[in-house]
Amino acid sequence: MGKTGSSKVKEKIKIFLTIIFLFNILSAEGIAGFAGSFLRFGTTAYSMSMGGGFTAAFDQGFPGYQNPASVGFLNDRNVTVLHHFLPLDRYLISGSFSTKLPPSAGLGIGIINAGVDKIDGRDASGKQTGLFSTEEYAIYLSFANKLVKKISLGVNVKIFYQVLPIEGRINSKGTGVDAGFIYRHSKNLELGFVIQDWNASYAWNTGEIFNEKGSTYEDEFPMQIRAGFVYRPGSFDIIGDYTYFQMGNHVSSNRIRLGGEYIPMERIFVRAGINNFLPSVGMGLQYSLLKPDDAQLDYALVLGMRGEGLSHVFTYVLKF
């Protein structure tokens, strides 16, 4: 790429970052307290090290998580395990499997488990009553099909389960749907769009707590509407997306995520990104286990919001 082309790329990047700064006024912290927050945290080290804005990008570790249309571009069968080492006695672990369905489709299944341990229980007088824990599960079923070589449409069906340490551990169940598409315009540009957590909610029966005075309560997830891109100007990738969150008719928020990956040498990847101006960095190593370049180990270091500290994310992917 010549000096003129390089300067134009740098100018476009500067303009884009300026737009991000001007429009990212509302923080996604506004929806942090609503149901399903563990699904908005992120999954693989690969994606989180670049800010997590993978609406248009392909994440082989969990292709259906960010956009179900991604599984339409699978070329192999992938199995993935990941672990988040989180502060404040929190945890998140996940596993997924995905495969190509000839001639033009893909299928994926994944499970996410998150929770909090060592919750200090107290009675009305302040006396300690013990340590408690809470946990949530989400099962993803993803399917996508390429309408043409460059366009894939996909859908996720998600099943939720949550357990709270109230009255001997009560639980709730729920479902949700995602739908999206990805357009691979060229080897240098990809675009994506997804609606996530449509009609997603937990259904609680408060009669388990208040006996005959209880009722059925629906705890809705904020719906996400996202648009994203992948741009490859040279020896590195630029990945990002914009998310609009909608909760009923009254609560809304937004989020910008942006990151990049550079390959300094074969099979070595260096990454960095931001998620609403919270930085993250990471790296990846691809190697041969059973066949050439069939395994990858990724790591991400993520800075949380004030008071949260650092999170360490490890992901292992095997293609077969």
Regions found by a protein language model. Name each.
Residues 1-36:
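Cleavable N-terminal export/targeting peptides
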Residues 3, 71, 105-106:
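A generic alpha-helix propensity feature with a strong bias for hydrophobic helices
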Residues 13, 18-20, 38, 62, ...:
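Generic intrinsically disordered, low-complexity segments enriched for polar/acidic and small residues
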Residues 29-51, 55-57, 76-79, 84, ...:
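Outer-membrane beta-barrel porins/channels
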Residues 62-73:
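N-terminal periplasmic accessory domains that precede
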